[in-house]
């Protein structure tokens, strides 16, 4: 009897449908996802290796970049392998516990990415607005403290989601029309009130919006400082140091912003568009970030070229 009740309260598994409406082309959709994952793995691993081995990159900016690379490896690995399983091998079933774990890591790494981008904006603000005090402010101790705060805040945002879902009874269908498990997608399957889940989810969105506001404020101060510089050459040089970070911010927040808008207001938009946009903001940034920094950062570019030249010889 207890086993039956437990099964009714928490289903043994869920079914992830992938991208509803595009099932016939799942196998082809999986191809770009596979290459994106390959770029994310190779690119972020290469950047971590270069930052570790290149003495000139042992600076606060690159320590934050190493954090971002580690997060991107985690985020891409938490999402894409399961997607490829759905697209190529039709492995749509995922256990209840597996789905919660899947959700935890996706939301955790997403929250981490957001706050690390704030830390990187703070780094650029100090570098441009207080250059003489840069190494005095961003000491190893402060960087470790920022990393600790990023982890703790992300846990604060995500751990309660697990318990909010565990308290819910699931007595309806167990089909999730998505490529991965996410909080509200699971909560909507419950046959009880999910008001607390919605409120906590809105609280998390508010924290992410706060991150965006902090980044904007940092760049307002940066732009003010830049345009106070005496020459255009100095201004362009200062702005160039922010180019990679701005590219990474846009790669992360732009798909997330459009995904939120279509989910909130695009009721007439086909469901597969919602799912594709939701995939973009967890899949694309981990692949784009190493490309953006690799192309725009001279030390990284030269170090990678030296590695390839040694390999060829």
Curated annotation (Swiss-Prot):
Cytoplasmic topological domain: 52-59, 123-144, 221-240, 296-313
Extracellular side, ranges: 1-30, 81-101, 166-199, 262-274
Annotated compartments: Membrane
Molecular functions per Gene Ontology: G protein-coupled receptor activity; olfactory receptor activity
Top-rank taxon: Eukaryota
Pfam family for this entry, one: 7tm_4
Signal peptide region: none
Residues bearing glycans: 5
Topology relative to the membrane: Multi-pass membrane protein
PANTHER family, per the entry: OLFACTORY RECEPTOR 52E8, OLFACTORY RECEPTOR 56B1-RELATED
Function, in words: Odorant receptor.
Family: Belongs to the G-protein coupled receptor 1 family.
Listed name of the protein: Olfactory receptor 52E8
């Amino acid at each position: 009897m207890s086993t039956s009740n437990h099964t009714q309260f928490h289903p043994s598994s869920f079914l992830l449908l992938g991208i509803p409406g595009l099932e016939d082309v799942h196998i082809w959709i999986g191809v770009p996802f596979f290459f994106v994952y390959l770029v994310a793995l190779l690119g972020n691993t290469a950047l971590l290796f270069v930052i570790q081995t290149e003495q000139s990159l042992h600076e606060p900016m690159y320590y934050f970049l190493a954090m971002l690379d580690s997060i991107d490896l985690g985020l891409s690995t938490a999402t894409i392998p399961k997607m490829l399983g759905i697209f190529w091998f039709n492995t749509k079933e995922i256990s209840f516990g597996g789905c919660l774990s899947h959700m935890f890591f996706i939301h955790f790494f997403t929250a981490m990415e957001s706050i690390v981008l704030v830390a990187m904006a703070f780094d650029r603000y100090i570098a441009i607005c207080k250059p003489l005090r840069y190494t005095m402010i961003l000491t190893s101790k402060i960087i470790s403290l920022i990393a600790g705060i990023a982890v703790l805040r992300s846990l604060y945002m995500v751990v309660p989601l697990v318990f909010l879902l565990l308290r819910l009874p699931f007595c309806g269908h167990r089909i999730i029309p998505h490529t991965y498990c996410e909080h509200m997608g699971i909560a909507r399957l419950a046959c009880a009130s999910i008001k607390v889940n919605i409120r906590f989810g809105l609280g998390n969105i508010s924290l992410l919006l706060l991150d965006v506001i902090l980044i904007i404020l940092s760049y307002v101060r940066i732009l003010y400082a830049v345009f106070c510089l005496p020459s255009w050459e100095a201004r362009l040089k200062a702005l160039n140091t922010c180019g990679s970070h701005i590219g990474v911010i846009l790669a992360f927040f732009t798909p997330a912003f459009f995904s939120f808008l279509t989910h909130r207001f695009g009721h007439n938009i086909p469901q597969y568009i919602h799912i594709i946009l939701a995939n973009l903001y967890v899949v694309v940034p981990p692949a784009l970030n190493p490309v953006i920094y690799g192309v725009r950062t001279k030390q990284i570019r030269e170090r990678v070229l030296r590695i390839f030249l040694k390999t060829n010889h």
